[in-house]
A protein has these predicted regions:
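Short internal beta-strands
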Residues: 2, 102-105, 130-136
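N-terminal phosphate/diphosphate-binding loop that engages ATP/GTP or pyrophosphate donors
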Residues: 1-52, 56, 63
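P-loop NTP-binding module
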Residues: 63-76, 98-101, 183-190, 195
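C-terminal lobe/tail of nucleotide-utilizing enzymes
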Residues: 120-195
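Phosphate-binding/switch loop-helix module in NTP-utilizing enzymes
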Residues: 42-84, 91
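Inter-motif core of Ras-like GTPase G domains
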Residues: 85-108
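A general structural detector for well-ordered alpha-helical segments in enzyme core domains, enriched
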Residues: 14, 58-61, 90-93, 118, ...
Length: 195
């Protein structure tokens, strides 16, 4: 599930990839109840399009999908302090849905501050943190994890590493290979226990 998709007109978009990876064919309006073409924060995109976001509508879609599947992965929308509505943030949605968080950090300078603040804020709101992933999404591995402070991040947050994802320059062509890589390195039985 991706509760709000911005940049919906880009192909493939996050929801396309999410549904392909999960191998599901649930209705699009359940997987992503709100979709906006503007690649902006949800509240800003919704305001620009004149479409108010109803958090209860997202909750109903979540509950419906949760009842259909043994495991439900909910992809975030930017960082945890990105506004979904004027006064309701991604962090609030995580707490409302009773989710654990897998924090994916960027493989670049500044990740110490960003990662520790994100984890500490989640913890202060009693959101369980299932692990940290260092992702070299937009860059080659110019700085090794040690130079980015990866060990310090793990020590300071007391959260387990779930892996380091290398930059893949030909992601479109290597999608299946990348999914295999992820399934072998990130997903473990203890990551998201089934309740």
């Amino acid at each position: 599930m991706k509760p709000v998709l911005t940049g919906a007109n880009m192909r493939p978009n996050d929801v396309d990839r999410l549904m392909q990876a999960a191998r599901v064919s649930d209705p699009l309006d359940l997987v992503s109840p709100y979709q906006f073409n503007h690649a902006l924060a949800p509240h800003i995109a919704a305001t620009r399009d004149g479409v108010p976001i109803d958090i209860q509508h997202i909750k109903i879609a979540f509950d419906t999908l949760h009842a259909r599947h043994d495991v439900l992965l909910v992809e975030g929308i930017g960082g945890i302090m990105v506004p979904i509505t004027k006064d309701f943030f991604v962090l609030d949605l995580i707490a409302l849905l009773g989710l654990s968080a897998l924090v994916v950090t960027r493989g670049d300078i500044g990740t110490i501050n960003h990662s520790i603040m994100t984890v500490k804020l989640l913890q202060s709101h009693e959101v369980p943190v299932a692990g940290l992933v260092l992702n070299y999404q937009n860059t080659t591995q110019a700085h090794p994890p040690e130079d980015l402070g990866w060990p310090e991040i793990l020590r300071s947050t007391e959260v387990d590493s779930r892996g380091v994802l290398p930059h893949i320059s030909n992601l479109e062509e290597a999608w299946d290979e990348g999914m295999e890589y992820l399934s072998q390195r990130l997903i473990t039985d203890d990551l998201f226990p089934v309740h």
